[in-house]
């Protein structure tokens, strides 16, 4: 979590007597001494520093040791003059810049740096060797150094393609300069490292010297020079790419002088905290491996191995130091001095700097035998690369060639694909450019049509409610007139029935109320007025029949009393004119192109002829019937097929205008919507109009109105079979309206009075005339019902006409009628109302079941006529026999052959076969 600070196990040694003496001498002014001669013997402690200087600074003449009381001290501690000060000039020695430097800033969460920087470096006094031994060691060191230099040059030539960024070069020392290694050898080595570029040839020797500083004797405490050399070695390994630090924490030691790089510590910390967004530069070994095509896995494995090896070595060093050093600290100063004197006497020179006991460790076998058992050897990380063979290079090149061939093949396929895509795109462009002709005009036309349709719909959204109101008003006007006529007929029937029933029954009634609970005086007053009006209408109808010569064939009750008063006619016409006037003002503020069927049709015909596909895709053929619906309903506002002067809708302008819509030279499809334009309009406009007429205006008692309704219905069925059929919803609604109106008439308007036969004997009496009128009106209604044959089903008609009217009312009138010629005539008129198709396909000798009661009445009528003729004159018998033959013929006409044969056999009618065949 936090960065660990690298610890340097440097402990401060106890003060000795010699150090106290040296501090006393330093307080005294230094004497001015001449520079020592080259052949002068080194002082105490000087001999052991000279070899170290040679090992660190490279080969060359050994400089004379300074005259100092303590080994390792430079000119500042001794009496010599350092730098460029001449002897005897009296100048004070130059102070070190380290003393004036500020204490570096401590790292976060660590106080170790400040303690380590302020501690004094522990120095070990070493015993002097003799001059002879020193010379011998120098000679052997030079020989070993030359051998190592040759080896270094060979390694440098192998790595010549990757020059080192920074190379440590040793400084050539001149014996005459009098410069010696001071107490702070680290500072002077930093000063010499700044001149690396001036002396590049010395780098190999220095690298070789650093590579040998990898062994530390157990219990030995490294000094500043050793620590600095180790840091230089590690820095060099990092720069060469052969070593990766085993921890990611910033190093606490400084590779250069503290006075020159104090500010670099803070920069390093900032760099460690800063997120790196750039690509990390590869090491020189990795670059070389990539150039020759070797995979990076070997180099990664090598770096990982070196990291593990370095980590293991560092751990063992720390363990060894922790075990041995406390023993040194626990001893007395005198014992320590004795221990170090004995150690230096038995230890070969240079062992404290990582050199294996002597300078002969580089190639001498004697040096190997001098190692003790407690020395732990560590393998120096090698900077050499893995061997590269011809086969390896050939294999890598072959693999790379194969991969390039595969890549080339893929690129070639992509190239061909792009070429084909380019050709297809070119063709598509040409095709689109060729087909783009008229798109602008088409877009312009469609935009105009879009605006026109929007305006048309906005106009209709405002005008359609007005059209609906006018249509409702005209329907209400016709409904009121029809209801008034029906109500008048019902009142006349009630008046006559009340009048004749009171005469026949002579019932006692309340003085002020009639039989219906009405005010007698007021009712009688209104009844008198209605009777006068009714008789006046009948007189006018009789006069009209006399003028036309139809008086002889007319039967009372067959005519319809639909005459209106002048007041009603005037009011009706005024209201009708008002509605028509308002209808003419509906589109008076609208342009003709938005209400004229011809103009609207022309717009869509232009669209259809120019851009038929878009016209078809927009389903205009399905929208046109709904679009023309309000305009057609406005023209059909007063259209009523019940009137004699009603105009046929197929002769109107809107029908003629839309009749040839979409008819062009090209062949039309069967399922095209434009072909069904007029049938769809008939379905959506005409049928709903007829439904309203059937519910509110049609009178089933009126033969004329019924004939006209049947005529228009059959015309629609025959002329528009695709829409006017039993499966069509609007057709079903229309037929239901007709059927409901007939049922209502049957329940509300049919009335058959029952009088005793003695009352009906007087054929000029009011009850007889009223009875005859009601009978013939029922027969008339039966005929009107049966006019719908072919429209309604046989079952529906038989149920409505035979069961509901004939068997319920007419047969009851037959029972009260006189048996004779009048009954036969009435029966003949009833049978004439039946459709002949009912009896054509009957099998057997029996008629339809609903007519069984009527046939029995005819058989009973024949028997009654025969019984009445017994005992009469021959003329009466002959008339009775003719009536019986007529009854047999009537039975045969309704396919009641069983009853006809029975009557003929009972009454000895011999011409049965001729009567049946001549039916």
Swiss-Prot record:
Gene that specifies this protein: Paxbp1
Lineage: Eukaryota, Metazoa, Chordata, Craniata, Vertebrata
Pfam families registered for this protein in UniProt: GCFC
Organism: Mus musculus (Mouse)
Modified residues (Phosphoserine): 16, 160, 193, 264, 297, 559-560
Residues modified as Phosphothreonine: 565
Entry's family note: Belongs to the GCF family.
Glycyl lysine isopeptide (Lys-Gly) (interchain with G-Cter in SUMO2) crosslink site(s): 151
Gene Ontology terms describing biological process: mRNA splicing, via spliceosome; muscle organ development; positive regulation of myoblast proliferation; positive regulation of transcription by RNA polymerase II; regulation of skeletal muscle satellite cell proliferation; transcription by RNA polymerase II
Gene Ontology cellular component list: nucleus
Tree of life domain: Eukaryota
Protein name as it appears in the record: PAX3- and PAX7-binding protein 1
Cross-link (Glycyl lysine isopeptide (Lys-Gly) (interchain with G-Cter in SUMO1)): 151
Swiss-Prot/TrEMBL keywords: DNA-binding, Isopeptide bond, Myogenesis, Nucleus, Phosphoprotein, Transcription, Transcription regulation, Ubl conjugation
Basic residues bias locations: 1-11
């Amino acid at each position: 979590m936090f960065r660990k600070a690298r610890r340097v196990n440097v402990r401060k040694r106890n003060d000795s007597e010699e150090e106290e003496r040296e501090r006393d001498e330093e307080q005294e002014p230094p004497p001015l001494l001449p520079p020592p001669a080259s052949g002068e013997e080194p002082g105490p402690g000087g001999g052991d520093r000279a070899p170290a200087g040679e090992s660190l600074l490279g080969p060359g003449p050994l400089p004379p040791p300074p005259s100092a009381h303590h080994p390792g001290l430079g000119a500042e501690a001794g009496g010599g003059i350092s730098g460029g000060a001449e002897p005897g000039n009296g100048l004070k020695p130059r102070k070190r810049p380290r003393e004036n430097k500020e204490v570096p800033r401590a790292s976060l969460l660590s106080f170790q740096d400040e303690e380590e920087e302020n501690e004094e470096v522990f120095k070990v006094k070493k015993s002097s060797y003799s001059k002879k031994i020193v010379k011998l060691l120098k000679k052997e060191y030079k020989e070993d150094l030359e051998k190592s230099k040759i080896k270094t040059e060979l390694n440098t030539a192998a790595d010549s393609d990757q020059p080192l960024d920074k190379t440590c070069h040793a400084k050539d020392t001149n014996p005459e300069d009098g410069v010696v290694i001071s107490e702070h050898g680290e500072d002077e080595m930093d000063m010499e490292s700044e001149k690396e570029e001036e002396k590049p040839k010395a780098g190999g020797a220095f690298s070789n010297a650093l590579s040998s500083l990898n062994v530390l004797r157990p219990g030995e405490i490294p000094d500043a020079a050793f620590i600095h050399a180790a840091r230089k070695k590690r820095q060099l390994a990092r720069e060469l790419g052969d070593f990766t630090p085993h921890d990611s924490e910033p190093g606490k030691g400084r590779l250069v002088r503290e006075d020159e790089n104090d500010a670099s510590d803070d920069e390093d910390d900032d760099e460690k905290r800063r997120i790196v967004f750039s690509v990390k530069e590869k090491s020189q070994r990795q670059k070389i491996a990539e150039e020759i095509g070797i995979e990076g896995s070997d180099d990664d494995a090598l770096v990982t191995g070196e990291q593990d090896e370095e980590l293991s070595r560092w751990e063992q060093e720390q363990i060894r130091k922790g075990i041995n050093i406390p023993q040194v600290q626990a001893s007395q100063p005198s014992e320590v001095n004795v221990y170090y004197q004995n150690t230096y006497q038995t230890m070969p020179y240079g062992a404290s700097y990582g050199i294996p006991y002597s300078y002969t460790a580089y190639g001498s076998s004697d040096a190997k035998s001098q190692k003790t058992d407690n020395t732990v050897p560590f393998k120096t990380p090698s900077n050499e690369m893995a061997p590269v063979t011809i086969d390896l290079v050939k294999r890598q090149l072959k693999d790379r060639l194969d991969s390039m061939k595969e890549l080339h093949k893929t690129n070639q396929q992509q190239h061909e694909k792009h070429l084909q895509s380019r050709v297809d795109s070119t063709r598509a462009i040409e095709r689109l450019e060729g087909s783009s002709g008229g798109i602008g005009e088409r877009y312009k036309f469609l935009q105009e049509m879009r605006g026109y349709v929007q305006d048309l719909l906005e106009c209709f959204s405002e005008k359609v409610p007005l059209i609906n109101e006018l249509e409702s008003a005209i329907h209400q006007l016709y409904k009121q007139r029809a209801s008034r006529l029906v109500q008048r007929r019902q009142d006349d029937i009630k008046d006559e029935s009340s009048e004749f029933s009171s005469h026949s029954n002579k019932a006692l009634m309340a003085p002020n109320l009639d039989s219906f609970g009405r005010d007698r005086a007021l009712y009688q007053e209104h009844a008198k007025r209605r009777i006068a009006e009714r008789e006046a209408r009948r007189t006018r109808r009789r006069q009209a029949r006399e003028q036309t010569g139809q008086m002889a064939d007319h039967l009372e009750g067959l005519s319809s009393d639909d005459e209106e008063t002048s007041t009603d006619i005037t009011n009706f016409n005024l209201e009708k004119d008002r509605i028509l006037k308002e209808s003419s003002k509906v589109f008076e503020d609208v342009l003709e192109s938005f209400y004229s069927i011809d103009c609207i049709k022309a717009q869509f015909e232009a669209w259809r002829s120019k851009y038929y596909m878009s016209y078809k895709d927009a389903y205009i053929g399905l929208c046109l019937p709904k679009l023309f619906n309000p305009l057609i309903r406005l023209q059909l506002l007063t259209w009523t097929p019940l009137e004699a002067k009603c105009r046929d809708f197929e002769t109107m302008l809107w029908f003629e205008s839309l009749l040839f819509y979409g008819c062009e030279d090209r062949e039309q499809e069967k399922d095209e919507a434009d072909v069904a334009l007029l049938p769809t309009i008939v379905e959506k406009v005409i049928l709903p109009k007829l439904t309203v007429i059937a519910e509110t205006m049609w009178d089933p008692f009126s033969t004329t109105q019924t004939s006209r309704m049947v005529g228009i219905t059959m015309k629609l069925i025959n002329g528009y079979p695709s829409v006017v059929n039993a499966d069509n919803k609007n057709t079903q609604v229309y037929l239901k309206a007709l059927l409901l109106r007939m049922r209502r008439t049957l329940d509300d308007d049919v009335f058959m009075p029952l009088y005793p036969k003695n009352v009906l004997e007087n054929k000029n009496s009011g009850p007889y005339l009223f009875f005859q009128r009601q009978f013939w009106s029922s027969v008339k209604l039966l005929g009107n019902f049966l006019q719908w044959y072919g429209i309604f089903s046989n079952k529906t008609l038989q149920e409505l006409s035979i069961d509901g009217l004939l068997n319920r009312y007419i047969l009851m009138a037959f029972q009260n009628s006189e048996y004779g010629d009048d009954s036969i005539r009435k029966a003949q008129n009833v049978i004439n109302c039946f459709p002949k198709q009912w009896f054509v396909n009957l099998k057997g000798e029996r008629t339809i079941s609903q007519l069984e009661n009527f046939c029995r009445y005819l058989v009973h009528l024949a028997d009654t006529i025969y019984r009445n003729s017994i005992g009469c004159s021959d003329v009466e018998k002959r008339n009775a026999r003719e009536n019986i033959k007529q009854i047999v013929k009537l039975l045969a006409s309704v396919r009641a052959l069983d009853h006809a044969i029975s009557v003929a056999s009972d009454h000895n009618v011999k011409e049965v076969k001729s009567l049946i065949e001549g039916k």
